[in-house]
């Protein structure tokens, strides 16, 4: 499926993680519910849930593979401690749900960040591993996951990525960015066709979107939560719809990324998305 027509994207960073409130069965049900509600763009990464996010997506969405946009990322690694504790994740999840201090320690450890590797061989191996976990032979969208700016100048890496793309292992190359400076550099890279970044409505985020538009490239946007959190009591989802309108009005916008593990929250976001689309069409 074309990423350009994907609409709202479900971010799956929390699926399979030690702190997710969902077990395996509930995670599968959430993904299938998302598909039933009309979500066709699913965003994950090799590191999410120590690979379990991809495994869950592969299991839940295999029957619909040709009808969805499947995106994943490579470049971040588990720490040695995370790798050691991965088999104990069900126990950690059970304890963290019942002991607040354990939950806090796990959350603090996650917030410290992870190692990164963008060596060509590692990225190729990571892509192949993701395909296996996702039960597919190709990705629609393959991101470099929060690289340092100098990674965008790594000619051997981009030569290897071009080779993998020619082999049909992924359709479109993107960069998922942690900041707008990196997003602007990624938008100008000749091989990068999609940039994922947090849109805040400010001048720099609009400049990134404008660069993408001029180059015929697209953006997948994060950041919707800032409008939701800024809403005044009694405003309902008006602020969220306003934020969505700002995103959807950008010609480069190919999708808005929303992460949730709650089916009700997902349905609410989709309702706001549809209202924003209706307002845009009526304008």
What does each model-identified segment do?
Residues 1-89, 250:
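N-terminal binding-site loop/beta-alpha segment at the start of enzyme catalytic domains
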Residues 2-8, 38-40, 64-68, 136-140, ...:
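Short, well-ordered coil/turn segments that N-cap beta-strands
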Residues 5-7, 69-73, 95-103, 141, ...:
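Non-cysteine beta-strand/loop elements that form the S-adenosyl-L-methionine
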Residues 13-25, 109-124, 232-237:
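Active-site mouth loops of central-metabolism enzymes
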Residues 26, 31-32, 50, 128, ...:
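Beta/alpha (TIM)-barrel catalytic core signal, keyed to glycine-rich beta->alpha loops juxtaposed to Asp/Glu
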Residues 32-35, 122-142, 164-167:
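CE4/NodB-like, metal-dependent polysaccharide N-deacetylase domain
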Residues 78-113:
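Alpha-helical membrane-targeting segments
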Residues 112-117, 144-150:
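Surface-exposed cleft-lining segments at the edges of enzyme active sites
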């Amino acid at each position: 499926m074309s990423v350009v027509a994907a609409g709202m994207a479900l971010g799956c960073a929390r699926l399979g993680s030690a702190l997710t409130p969902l077990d395996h069965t509930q995670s599968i049900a959430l993904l299938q519910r998302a598909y039933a509600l009309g979500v066709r763009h699913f965003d994950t990464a090799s590191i999410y849930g120590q690979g379990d996010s991809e495994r869950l997506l592969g299991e839940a969405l295999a029957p619909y593979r040709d009808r969805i946009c499947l995106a994943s990322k490579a470049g971040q690694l588990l720490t040695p401690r995370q790798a050691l504790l991965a088999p104990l994740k069900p126990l950690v999840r059970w304890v963290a749900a019942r002991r607040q201090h354990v939950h806090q320690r796990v959350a603090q450890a996650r917030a410290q960040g992870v190692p990164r590797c963008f060596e060509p061989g590692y990225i190729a191996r990571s892509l192949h591993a993701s395909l296996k976990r996702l039960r597919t032979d190709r990705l629609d969208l393959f991101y470099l996951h929060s690289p340092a700016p100098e990674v965008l100048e790594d000619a051997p890496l981009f030569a290897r990525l071009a080779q993998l793309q020619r082999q049909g292992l992924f359709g479109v190359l993107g960069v998922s960015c942690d900041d707008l400076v990196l997003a602007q550099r990624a938008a100008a890279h000749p091989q990068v066709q999609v940039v994922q970044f947090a849109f805040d409505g400010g001048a720099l985020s609009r400049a990134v979107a404008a660069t993408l538009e001029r180059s015929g490239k697209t953006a997948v946007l994060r950041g919707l939560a800032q409008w939701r959190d800024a809403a005044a009591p009694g405003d309902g989802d008006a602020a969220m719809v306003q934020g969505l309108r700002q995103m959807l009005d950008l010609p480069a916008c190919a999708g808005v990324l929303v992460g949730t593990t709650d089916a009700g929250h997902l349905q609410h976001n989709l309702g706001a998305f549809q209202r924003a689309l209706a307002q845009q069409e009526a304008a």
